[in-house]
Amino acid sequence: MSSLVRPINLGKINNSQSTVKDYILLMKPRVMSLVIFTGFVGMWLAPYSVHPFIAGIAVVCIALGAGSAGAINMWYDRDIDSLMKRTQKRPIVRGVIESDEALSFGLITGFFAVFFMALCVNLLASFLLLFTIFYYICIYTIWLKRRSIQNIVIGGVSGALPPVIGYAAVSNTISLESIILFLIIFIWTPPHSWALALFCNDDYKNCKVPMMPAVKGTVYTKKQILIYSILLFIVSLMPFFIGMNNFIYLIISGILGVVFLYYAGSLFYDTPDNKQAKRFFAYSIFYLFFIFLLLYSTNTISTIS
């Protein structure tokens, strides 16, 4: 794949410029914060009790695991990151962290995350965390991202697993409840990512990453976004119907879902500056956060004690 992009020049790196902030940025803190939150909600919804200290260790391990995957992703994608406006300020591209240091950092943090999850929490949660890191790096980043138009769809498995890990950290099981949490994020990921791809289309074309708008065009992409948005609306109501959350959840999640559908439909009337795509992308982040906040606040079970 090296022929698809020009190599990044890392010859001007000055290690003394590296700061704690740079290593935090290497771990993709925005993504990591959502991973931590959804993982915590998964823990909260498990119908078992766990000591807060163990819960805290589990959250830290999930955070480190997500950061590990993010760091290794930046290491592998450093060539295309240098070509995209959206990613040109990442630490490796700016030259404040060497690529081999980023890889070592990612591997070490990932090892400790999985190890301490196994040592202090349970083996199932540790295995799921290991699988998530492996899937994000090997299946999504290395295999799918630069090869398949379905990169986001298939690769979305890793981003949807944190609440399953959190649930398993408390219950040592995988249940229907945790699978529904998984499905909400899994189905949310494609429309969220394709909205980003709509207004970053030139970037993806420039580095030859086969995102759907670049390969199939914007109209086809918008149709797919609408289809997934309808599926998301249906799946997001399931926690109420299996007794996981109360009637308040049903009403508010339904309203949020209708707004999500409105923004998805508005994409067909977007302006050349992709104003609606940007609005939809921003709302999709708010939507997922608020859905999981609702899952947390309206659940019919209590766990962490």
Swiss-Prot record:
Q: Which reaction(s) does the protein catalyse, per the Swiss-Prot or TrEMBL entry?
A: heme b + (2E,6E)-farnesyl diphosphate + H2O = Fe(II)-heme o + diphosphate
Instruction: Report the GO terms under cellular component.
Output: plasma membrane
User: Which InterPro entries does UniProt cross-reference here?
Assistant: Protohaem_IX_farnesylTrfase, UbiA_prenyltransferase, UbiA_prenylTrfase_CS, UbiA_sf
What CDD domains does this protein's entry cite? PT_UbiA_Cox10
Spell out the subcellular localization from the entry.
Cell inner membrane
Report the principal subcellular site.
membrane
The protein's topology relative to the membrane is: Multi-pass membrane protein
Decide whether keyword Glycosyltransferase is in the record. no
Q: Would you kindly state one Gene Ontology biological process term found in this protein's UniProt entry?
A: heme O biosynthetic process
Quote the Pfam families the UniProt record gives: UbiA (PF01040)
Q: What is its EC number?
A: 2.5.1.141
Identify this protein by name: Protoheme IX farnesyltransferase
Give the organism, scientific name: Rickettsia rickettsii (strain Sheila Smith)
Cite the source lineage. Bacteria, Pseudomonadati, Pseudomonadota, Alphaproteobacteria, Rickettsiales
